[in-house]
Amino acid sequence: MGKTMWARAVFLCFSVGTLLWQEVLTRRIPVDTGQCGLPKSQEDLNSFLWTVRRHPPAYLFGTIHVPYTRVWDFIPQNSKKAFHDSNSVYFELDLTDPYTISALANCQMLPQGENLQDVLPRDLYRRLKRHLEYVKHMMPHWMTPDQRGKGLYADYLFNAIAGNWERKRPVWVMLMVNSLTEADIRSRGVPVLDLYLAQEADRMKKKTGAVERVEEQCHPLNRLNLSQVLFALNQTLLQHESLRAGSFQAPYTTEDLIKHYNCGDLNAVIFSHDSSQLPNFINVTLPPHEQVTAQEIDIYFRQELIYKRNERMARRVIALLKENKDKSFFFAFGAGHFLGNNTVIDVLRQNGYEVEHTPAGQTFTAAKPKTNPTSDDSMATDSPAMKYFDHVPATASYFGESDEEMLPPHLLLPDSISQLEEFGKQNSWHRKHYRNQRPRQFNDLWVRLDDSTTTLPSNTRNTNGEQSAESLVWLPEQDHHNYLDVKLSHSQSNSSPKCLSASPAFLYTLVTLCLITTMRTRS
């Protein structure tokens, strides 16, 4: 009788383990996303709006590169009014210009006749190829029913993001890998905040422009030496392999960024991470020689992608303000450019401009556009400040810079602006678009690093190690909305719970404890 009971107990333990494992494979376990509720009053909202005191006024607005529906309801009404009442709206890049697309595509490519396999070490190339095969296999499972309902197809989406990857420079492949996460794929379907503002400005017939060029943004990345690029690509692959294996969780996630933007502290660290779009590779677990490489990359990125970029953007803002004294402006840049040290605001103040933070709930009277900006010939389009924005290479005389100064520019690195192709100005995608292989669009070229991380687990440091990655880490799923139906005055923001798959080790431990208890009972 005792043996029979013991056998039944053993069978029960294994049955429990099997059922738990099946639950993990077939169902997602909800985890609190930690998102905050919408405040009851405007005064309680975070404000990323600054006012440049002039007549008419100019505004600086800090954005983040996430789907706009996740943050729009948390943006104060006075920020939206400033956008609505401004004559001109300027961004970091012209998000809807075909020239941007072709220039970025050319910048990312290796020299003619070279392939990635010729540049990368064999082991690193093999790991990269295997990871991309894994992503391609998983993409149909990552996509949401809502995305499929809008006509997005996994094969098309993968090729749109990773197409021709073997011809790209290694540093751009690294950024591409960071954009091929489940969280990023599931966020496709709604334009990011920057792109939404650009589309709204276009719909409202406002004058739009940019303060940066693609050529400027590409050069800093392409000037990294090969050893630095290989180090960065290896670190990136290691962290994604660890995420696949369930042994690692990124400290900076899209959800963290959204929470800080909507209701958290104005933490310059996390917003700088979003604005530079590159991880900090410094890690205390690295050996000394790799620490040196990581520090060199960190210093280079910080100088080129944040400080120099802030300086250049501010000088071009100043040029626009001087050349168009009777026009009101709304400058929408990444929030990280306005927070911390050596910011765009600091440069403006150093040049005599009075810039004040505009709290949520503060009322002001903005100057409304006098005429239709698109037909207003009084805009100084032939001025030195405006010549820069023409589709021709800028010369030194445009901004009083030498050719040498024009070369080391600043970078709006890939982010979730990478949405124009799927969502652009069309209602939906159809399979025929993939079959016809139409020209690639802006979002194919921009990638995002929202879920990248600045640290690496010590047990995965081996640069030539082969990783086993069978268990998945489920990341947030977005409940998307058709942005064409959402007007400037209102949006909806829903997200389903963040989910994590249970670790196999945890399940086996549970079964083992059950067996031990059973054996003790038998004895």
Curated annotation (Swiss-Prot):
InterPro entries hit by this protein: TIKI1/2-like, TraB/PrgY/GumN_fam
UniProt keywords, alphabetically: Cell membrane, Glycoprotein, Hydrolase, Membrane, Metal-binding, Metalloprotease, Protease, Signal, Transmembrane, Transmembrane helix, Wnt signaling pathway
Cofactor(s) listed: Mn(2+); Co(2+)
N-terminal signal peptide: 1-26
Chief location: membrane
Highest rank taxon of the organism: Eukaryota
Residues on Cytoplasmic side: 517-523
Additional facts recorded: Was named TIKI in reference to large-headed humanoid in Polynesian mythology.
Protein name: Metalloprotease TIKI2
Organism of derivation: Xenopus tropicalis (Western clawed frog)
Gene name linked to the record: trabd2b
